[in-house]
């Protein structure tokens, strides 16, 4: 072994968590090393070639609001953009983009290669140098030593990864990529709570072998939405349709007949798979009453000859995969280019992490991505960003930062993982966010860009554009609040073709709160009698003003709930070294509180098994200590 080079921060793994972690720390001025087994696989979309979706697009836009890469990259790589839940309220609308997986990798590499302070190195990591439970660097498989005071581990599905196709088992975390078994086994010296999770992917199909003529086309939205705050429609490559087909009784009978050959049901795989992205075997067993399951045939790229059949993940033997694929309408002559497979891998209990994603056991070791029990590119990228920025803050001897549950979906993700842990792959949904009316995808920049600028994640160019937008929103909102409409004013709504008579005096902003009145209707009405005509062409600005108005009452209610939430979050528990010293706590409470070491009363509340009685005892204990004028170190 020999010393090679020293860095401020080393990131192991260049998937979605690793790329965001390395980008964040280097943007904040830290000399960063991003090390990966293969440079050619940086930013690979290992499974579904898509970014965003319900609950996920909110994460992507929050990453973007903090200067991250994912939104920028997909804007240059997306070949079909759609708004999901477009007929519902803004709180649950989510953008999804089909990606050209080759363009996505190319564009991710472009941004990383042009990032200052960032070095990319190709080699497998065999061990993390840890002395006295503190990180000091890494060792590569060929004996190179890279020294660093902070290491961020983002190994994805590669720690002791095993791939399954029927009875065939291979070492690997992804097709054509070997697992990081040496590193995984070395980490077992320091971590006892290591579990196994499972994920899977469908077979890939040859495009020319599919009969698209009998299938339903699915087009993207027009005009196409964008992900990044700085994104433009002109950045999008050529847009293409997807296609829809369905499984049938024959498909289901093939699967049932051969279920014993699936490693999921033969006992070969013990890890739990993602609940909300089940294999086709799981779907048939768990939903026996369904006569068919929808499959989206998604192109893997503009010029790609490969189709991704979304919704039919499987690890059945290769010959059975051929039979089940060819039983489906439009796929009767389909040729499988790559067989579907399942992957089982190691993950760590995220409750052993601080909210910054630093290990509670190993000083200066941060962990992000699927190794923390999540599933999905977006969840991994969000964790990578938080780990990267907090690693940089630690180098700079500055206070740590992470968003709270009321500030971002990223905050919900981090809090759920670190407070509750997970026994199955964790996926983000809008339903997980109790303050989702405030955490809309269209106000991510308003919520997070200011702190991003203060942290050094956002450049001056973006800050100026953001500030200008916020000024425009503020001016227009105030203008509407200062326009007084008198009783008996007649207003026509184009939404429901009705004439509205005002019964009492109100402001134009208040009038906009009515569900049947759109911003465009209001402006047309106001311009008909105002001397100074107002025309705002920026759709983002008008949507935000309309949302603020229509959600006004609900937002006020949630802000009251947040005050209560903050009260508990501000009651810190750092002063308690051993919960056995507190009289009245149950044995279960003592064991769980000593085990998970919650940072606040709020976090303690979210630990399974912690009762209101326990919380009351803790609050009384803190109050007594405060009266005795104890100093609490935050």
From Swiss-Prot:
Pfam families: GIDA, GIDA_C_1st, SAM_GIDA_C. FAD binds at residues 13-18. GO terms for molecular function: flavin adenine dinucleotide binding. The keyword NAD applies. InterPro entries: FAD/NAD-bd_sf, GIDA_C_N, MnmG, MnmG-rel, MnmG-rel_CS, MnmG_C, MnmG_C_subdom, MnmG_C_subdom_sf. SMART domains: GIDA_assoc_3. Its main location: cytoplasm. Keywords: Cytoplasm, FAD, Flavoprotein, NAD, tRNA processing. NAD(+) binds at residues 273-287. One of its GO terms (biological process) is tRNA methylation. GO terms for cellular component: cytosol. Its cofactor is FAD. It is found in: Cytoplasm. Disulfide bonds: none annotated. PROSITE patterns: GIDA_1 (PS01280), GIDA_2 (PS01281). Belongs to the MnmG family. NAD-binding protein involved in the addition of a carboxymethylaminomethyl (cmnm) group at the wobble position (U34) of certain tRNAs, forming tRNA-cmnm(5)s(2)U34. Homodimer. Heterotetramer of two MnmE and two MnmG subunits. This is tRNA uridine 5-carboxymethylaminomethyl modification enzyme MnmG.
